[in-house]
Amino acid sequence: MLAPLLFGVAAQIEAIDPELMARDGTRLRKNVAELRRMLGTDAVFCSAPHGSLATALGAPDSGDCADRLAADARVQASLEAVRQWQADASEPVVIAAFQGPSTLAAALRQAQPGLDAEALYEHLGRGLAVLVRLFAETGVHGVQFHEAAAPPPGEVDCWKDALGTAGNVARFHRVAPVLVVQDPGFKSWPAQMVACPGATQRSAALMRPHGQALSGDPQHWPEALATGPLEKLVTTTEEVPPAHELPGLVQRLARLKGA
């Protein structure tokens, strides 16, 4: 399944600000759906990783985050887009993409240094599980967690526990939980996640179905796509920049697919 993380770039279709599109479920659905039609990709994204998620989740001492997540404008718009896709006769594959717990932990520590790792990751795991449940019950087919960097060595177990909490909720709802990590040297893929390694992150021990992560910059995509027998998904390490020009994106995807 070819599914580069294309979201904000869809706002070019209507010539509106990507942030405005991300807060309007109908515009989100129309523009992202039209982008999929133009490019011939295999999935649509109802959300992309964004810094507002850390604010909605809050620190461990901020209490239950369920109400804050449900009230978040971007979350509400994404869920509304999923509902509209549910009524779409074409029934596209819908994926929700979020920041992962390591990225969220780093953001929360910028605002509140010294947060205890165990308490922080436990809080993030519960919060991401709530988020996954919201999207799974609304009708997404997959959730992707994108990490800007791997967790510090001393926090790997806490990080894996947080991913496991969210991943268990996804699997309960029969939604694929995917992990993408930008760190080129990262190879310690948690069993709870569908790994999506980049070219330098593949491991001989990865003998289960997994994906492949291309660069978030289409200029760095290969001339032709090559996938192994266990690679079921091709996405990108991060969101394709919203300012990337659509004509060039059409050409890059056509070359990638060998068209």
Predicted segments with their positions:
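Alpha-helix-loop-beta-strand connector modules within alpha/beta enzyme cores
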Residues: G63-V93, G154-L179, D183-G185, L256
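Alpha/beta catalytic barrel-like cores
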Residues: M1-E80
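Catalytic domains of carbohydrate-active enzymes, especially glycoside hydrolases
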Residues: R27-G51, V130-G142, V169, M193, ...
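Catalytic-face loop-and-helix region of soluble metabolic enzyme cores
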Residues: R174-A259
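Active-site mouth loops of central-metabolism enzymes
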Residues: E14-L28, Q110-R126, V130, G211-G216
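Active-site-proximal loop/short-helix segments
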Residues: H50-A54, G58, I95-Q112, T138-A162
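Active-site-proximal, glycine-rich beta->alpha crossover segments in alpha/beta enzymes
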Residues: T55-L134
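Short, well-ordered coil/turn segments that N-cap beta-strands
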Residues: M1, G40-A43, A89-V94, G139-H141, ...
